[in-house]
Amino acid sequence: IQNPEPAVYQLKDPRSQDSTLCLFTDFDSQINVPKTMESGTFITDKTVLDMKAMDSKSNGAIAWSNQTSFTCQDIFKETNATYPSSDVPCDATLTEKSFETDMNLNFQNLSVMGLRILLLKVAGFNLLMTLRLWSS
């Protein structure tokens, strides 16, 4: 994702209507994240996520509370962030497919391990034969 816009995601616990968590991502490092709002609301300092595969960095902060009146818009209102629709449910079964392992990659890793073991055995055998030749 090139030049992502700052966004705030609100996550709610389906079993408890009191627990709410806000994830604030992709904001500029000059934006000041509020430290505390009220008792019962916890806000982390901003954290830099270094994504070396994409050669980019992303800032993130988390706020959570057990109060029913807690909303993400109140916490991060000065940040000019977008608030994606909360109508889309977070389904863990949809994300599992992207985390499946690749069979070819597993086979290649196994092949490399086998070749390393074979190389170690050959080097050990050569060393043993060389020492035996020197001793006689």
Curated annotation (Swiss-Prot):
- Quote the Pfam families the UniProt record gives: DUF1968 (PF09291)
Which ranges does the record mark as transmembrane? Answer: 111-131
Sugar attachment sites: 66, 80, 109
Q: Which GO terms describe its cellular component?
A: T cell receptor complex
Q: Domain Ig-like C1-type, which positions?
A: 19-103
Name the segments for region: Connecting peptide. 90-111
Task: State where the protein is found.
Answer: Cell membrane
What does the record list as GO biological process? adaptive immune response
Cysteines engaged in disulfide bonds, as pairs: 22-72
- Protein name as it appears in the record: T-cell receptor alpha chain constant
